[in-house]
Amino acid sequence: TDGHRLALSETEATDLNSISTCIIPRKCISELKRILTTYSDENSNLITIGVNSRNLVAKTNNYVIKSKLIEGKYPDYRKVFPENLPHVLKLNKNNFKSALQRMSILSSEQYKGVKLSLNATSLDLTTTNPQQEKGEDKIDCSYTGEPMEVGFNLAYLLEVIDVIETDNVQLRFDTQDTGCLLTSDDNSPTSKYIIMPMRV
């Protein structure tokens, strides 16, 4: 989490000696991701992780990574993931991604906002920039709830869409001022994402 977004991912583990909670530095996570995606042994997808009060050691067939842990207690993240949200948007992942990419043409380092206008059968996307340029797009969707408008950081939405593996995605809202819950469109998603809204 960075205060604007939060991700939760769960995976199956075997041979657990105990359950530990720790905070791993971002640099260590990035290095693990690089090794597992680039140099993974095709015959084994297993990784062994050991944790004590100060360090983490991760081992694959060919690599060992050791990292110091971040001291402190991680916030109670499960309270951030709400349930029974009244506004539910379902749409095709690739259509949504393409529309966001078209909107991103007008974005810059200083401005990356996009406004989503939610209706029963369509999602309208709008973006503007300081040069008074404006982009608009519309895609089909299924939406349950009162019509509403909410703004988000384009880059944050695209990053989440890129890692969701199902054909469709779900966005769930309470109000336009609270975080959006993004998941795959299945009954028991193993990964969940919260993105906070922004003014656009």
Label each region the model flagged.
Residues 1-8, 15-70, 85-200:
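DNA polymerase processivity clamps
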Residues 73:
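Glycine-rich, pocket-lining loop/helix-strand segments that form or immediately flank
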Residues 76-87:
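Short, flexible active-site loops
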